[in-house]
Amino acid sequence: MNTILAQQIANEGGVEAWMMAQQHKSLLRFLTCGSVDDGKSTLIGRLLHDTLQIYEDQLSSLHNDSKRHGTQGEKLDLALLVDGLQAEREQGITIDVAYRYFSTEKRKFIIADTPGHEQYTRNMATGASTCDLAILLIDARKGVLDQTRRHSFISTLLGIKHLVVAINKMDLVDYREETFARIREDYLTFAEQLPGDLDIRFVPLSALEGDNVAAQSANMRWYSGPTLLEVLETVDIQRAVDRQPMRFPVQYVNRPNLDFRGYAGTLASGSVKVGERIKVLPSGVESSVARIVTFDGDKEEACAGEAITLVLNDDIDISRGDLLLAANETLAPARHAAIDVVWMAEQPLAPGQSYDVKLAGKKTRARIEAIRYQIDINNLTQRDVESLPLNGIGLVEMTFDEPLALDIYQQNPVTGGLIFIDRLSNVTVGAGMVRELDERGATPPVEYSAFELELNALVRRHFPHWDARDLLGDKHGAA
């Protein structure tokens, strides 16, 4: 058994007490990225090893694997803890996104180890989409490379505000302070071009030797800052979704019997309370919250990130893909938008093409109208292109087949992020982040026939309990 885990359970007074303590720890999701062979997998292996998260049988297996596939001579190849695919071990690289979990006394962590090779940039974007922080590894011998810039830009494009620049392999440059200072200055010069208000920190370390990973290095006394683990344990993650208005995408209509009808999903942003008035988009019909049902029982209030089922006081038409928000909120459905796209398919993205797009449970069709520009990752300049190639990043104008309730991605990743799906193969071919909502996206006023208006008036007069909307709105009242 993992000795540190056994000790923690004993200190907490049993398994149940330990599990309760784990539930109240904050969770940090982070990814490691950078150029190929910068030591990302080795760093994660070092974190797991030095925080005593490796079981005895895993350690024994690691000794054997290091002899067969290792790249560190007689030393343990800690990268093998993460590189699980046979092709990864044979080539000594990371191909797929590998997820690992560990915890300390202060915090819980979920790590995404992403590929460094350019042809796997799409995998890196997938790993970054759910993370709060990015560790950008830089080989102290090579400095800032193109792939470092690419991963930095993708991370910030996907809404990550906290960047930890880990300058690795300091042991191979004799732990020289001037090397660290030069790379730090080079990266800060590049970072001036990155979008958003970023929190950037620098840590010199050696993942292979363990310097400044979980313990202070005796070889770099010139560095007085925190270790990498201390940064991860103490960084204050302010999630934008906590401060945004309530958004609840319906993922599933829960109807186990005739007496229960609920709408299941994860609260994307804001909070919702029992009794609160809500509005359904795109229909615009209003109701109020009767119950908030969870696995652990009913609640009076739910916050962003919680998986809940909402029961409403009225039987109204709601289906998968609809969006619930506060009744006093205004969110005009849009048919036109400018989307930041990370393209993931061999066939380039070009104007005139149509794809299925999926947004928070809603699936519809979209047409590519124009490509405004592609980003040159080397210098973050914009260039005109006729198509967007594999791993290309650019700003694209799109038109949806139907109006969609969208937010700007930087404000709400759930209702502002979408994926492109090939209509023939059903393969995901791209990821998109809403940058702008076109003013043409507002739904135009609907012209109703005389029959529709008369029928609406009849229903409201004789069936007021149906809560039918007045089609004439303010004009009717004024008349």
UniProtKB/Swiss-Prot annotation:
Residues 92-96 are annotated as: G2. Residues 168-171 are annotated as: G4. Residues 34-41 are annotated as: G1. It comes from the Bacteria. Keywords: ATP-binding, GTP-binding, Nucleotide-binding, Nucleotidyltransferase, Transferase. InterPro entries: CysN_GTP-bd (IPR041757), CysN_II (IPR044138), CysN_NoDQ_III (IPR044139), G_TR_CS (IPR031157), GTP-eEF1A_C (IPR054696), P-loop_NTPase (IPR027417), Small_GTP-bd (IPR005225), SO4_adenylTrfase_lsu (IPR011779). Pathway: Sulfur metabolism; hydrogen sulfide biosynthesis; sulfite from sulfate: step 1/3. Its EC number is 2.7.7.4. One of its GO terms (molecular function) is GTP binding. Residues 25-239 form the tr-type G domain. It catalyses: sulfate + ATP + H(+) = adenosine 5'-phosphosulfate + diphosphate. Residues 113-116 are annotated as: G3. Transmembrane segments: none annotated. The keyword GTP-binding applies. GO terms for biological process: hydrogen sulfide biosynthetic process; sulfate assimilation. GTP binds at residues 34-41, 113-117, 168-171. Heterodimer composed of CysD, the smaller subunit, and CysN. With CysD forms the ATP sulfurylase (ATPS) that catalyzes the adenylation of sulfate producing adenosine 5'-phosphosulfate (APS) and diphosphate, the first enzymatic step in sulfur assimilation pathway. APS synthesis involves the formation of a high-energy phosphoric-sulfuric acid anhydride bond driven by GTP hydrolysis by CysN coupled to ATP hydrolysis by CysD. This is Sulfate adenylyltransferase subunit 1. It comes from Salmonella schwarzengrund (strain CVM19633).
